[in-house]
Amino acid sequence: MLFAIGNAGSNIVETIRKESENAALKKIRNVFADCDENDLKKHKAEDCQLIHLNKDEDEFPNEIFDGIEKLVIVTGLGGKTGTKYAELAAKSAVDAGVTSVNVIATLPFFFEGNNRINLATSAARKLTDINGMNVTIVNNEEILEKYPDLDFFNAFDATDKKIMQIVKDIL
């Protein structure tokens, strides 16, 4: 299962869904979860499941992971939805007995401000403290440093492609 949480995660998984030529990625179950119902509607398709999250909930429904052996959660950290629900979903998946739980999370750009960066860093630490799963952190700022000619929008594309490769390697 490829599980997108929040706007950043959903945008990344949508790119993977549309652009990947990989047979395994074409067959995988795509799930999009967000607190914003309008954002969820952007990902409505026959091969996708949509989950509207209640921003006041502090639990995650375990039943979503019934029968799942391999899970890849994709999210951005530093905002509200991904920061909160990546941890809840990961714990829920581990508790539900998912054999392979992987979280791929992005860190914000510097220009997004210290509040988002601090929130993301704290969330990344919490994710790495969960036993029974793998966490990969993709730092958007490092992508800009590696490819200084990229503008802001192309940096997102580079991040999406990097994460697509990580997902392929996991599957």
Feature roles, as predicted:
Residues M1-L171:
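Tubulin/FtsZ superfamily GTPase core signature
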